[in-house]
Amino acid sequence: MPDAFAELRHELAVANRILANEGIIDAFGHISVRNPKDPNRYFISRHRASELVEPSDILEMTLDSKPVVPTNVRLYSEMVIHGEIYKVRPDVNSVCHHHAPSVLPFCATGVELVPLFHLGGTLGSKVPFWDSRDELGDTNLLVSTPEEGASHARALGPHYMLLLRRHGASLAGTSLRECVFRSIYTTRNAELQLRALAIGALGPLSPGEVEKCGGHNLGPRGVERAWEYWVTRLQKAEAMWAAAGLPRMKDLGRIARPQTAGLTPARSAPRRVARAASKTRARNRR
């Protein structure tokens, strides 16, 4: 039977690998996307490191974070992060949770993360904190129960980024590609803030600048341009892996094309990828 969501599963697998390739997600972390035909369901990978996720790993879940089709495969322990946000935020169609090194100092100290450059406008007007101790006392710091997931979702409120004390960050987007865009550029903003603090006083964006920068950067042309760039970087990385005899994801290039009407479809880079692989094989023979 044909899979009506084959393209979506493929794109979600690519999103996982992009976030790994860009250093946002390592062995731990995950990203999901809401079912575009049924808002009471979402898609997410089985329990696996994002760098290794394949379309066949993608499962469909209810908003209670239970598999739609019963399965014996292992699931992420923090699925409720996704399901509970989808329950209370109908505007959100993608959720990412990560522990990027640049955001962890803010999680450890409680220092506010503020937008400092134009692409940092994707932070939004405020980045709230969630401290699980406030409602739940001592825990293992994972968000793994419905109660913890609901508390986490309440802390996010109407915002698009949440910092978890002593843990990491959760991001939301109106689309999968927007969520990837926000996940990457909010970590870049965190890197900038850490460096800027070593030089002098911060000069954050004004509320008006945040609104205008965020609206511009998250428009279709900005998101699609960045997506094409990240897919190309991933193609090059996977070509190097293939040259070294490591497995790579099939049909990666086809997902680089923009989804927005009026945009010129992205050209794949098979020749560049082949040349990179050839050069690597030549070096390995020396």
Describe every region a protein language model picked out:
Residues 1-286:
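Glycine-rich flexible loops
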